[in-house]
């Protein structure tokens, strides 16, 4: 079969690469993709993620069996609804089901309604009311833009002043446009964060290995929030009993709740969780695979990914099998200045071979050659599997030391929480 992946980042590179491993898959197209993907035999289609009718026409003309949608903004724009109306299958939630991600307030209301553990909160569109709530609650406190903001719409404020300023930027200064026209202000939860993913169709779901992401830009969890600077799986200090509790108290009730609400869920459900003294609680839901978690989870899958997704799409039982030993770890290399203003056009090191995989995100070919240049905030990610976190760190970081990363930066402590 021929498949289409919508998106352009490292996540979509990992999805397409894994689908291409299937003996049943003849071709994988990515729209619009990035030039780095072509080094793995992936074909790029020059159609943007918002061009739904062009994507639908391409899928029809090229006999695409189904489409895997990567990015949150495409889902929020109703791409899956449009494909389904055209009689095409797409793996991803409808616009209404994806509201779990594109409105933090909606997600909070659903969690309250169905008794799902999460932080106490208030939602505000009026700055003075938000300010009064912050002053009443005190700090630390978390201020979130209600809508999509590329993973950068969350401020963990250490002081009341910092929280008020974050609310002011969103509500009065229009920092995130319509996405920040409402803010959700939450109690700060202390604990270990982890990412739980499930492949879902209605009440049928399959839990993936649990990963830990590193959101802050710099070592020691310093600096601004980013889309993610690295991740690893498995999380050795997270007992299976915690995952089981999260499935019972969070995943099952949210999926049942969405069915009750008439928003039955299809696709990847991503629960960003935190292990508190009261057990796991939800920080956020996302309606798609995480980036960079996808790049470390999918290499551990030993079953046929294309067959698994095909089965789930058609509501057939499927069997996902995984590497059950060792650790897979990945480090993101980003452009200097990210997540704020960053440089572009930096020459990238050669693609790695052997047991270190390179997944590309912001990369393009130079005008007159096949040299890859940086073309985004997060540029590429190196991923490897080893017996222990330390072994994986050693492999990745020794490779990075040998690369010319002028104009780029990366965190040097990915996975270190697991080796304390």
Swiss-Prot record:
Pathway: Purine metabolism; IMP biosynthesis via de novo pathway; N(1)-(5-phospho-D-ribosyl)glycinamide from 5-phospho-alpha-D-ribose 1-diphosphate: step 2/2. Keywords: ATP-binding, Ligase, Magnesium, Manganese, Metal-binding, Nucleotide-binding, Purine biosynthesis. It catalyses: 5-phospho-beta-D-ribosylamine + glycine + ATP = N(1)-(5-phospho-beta-D-ribosyl)glycinamide + ADP + phosphate + H(+). Mg(2+) binds at residues 284, 286. ATP binds at residues 134-195. SMART domains: GARS_A, GARS_C. Its EC number is 6.3.4.13. It comes from Streptococcus suis. It comes from the Bacteria. NCBIfam families: purD. Binds 1 Mg(2+) or Mn(2+) ion per subunit. GO terms for molecular function: ATP binding; metal ion binding; phosphoribosylamine-glycine ligase activity. Belongs to the GARS family. Its cofactor is Mg(2+); Mn(2+). This is Phosphoribosylamine--glycine ligase. GO terms for biological process: 'de novo' IMP biosynthetic process; purine nucleobase biosynthetic process.
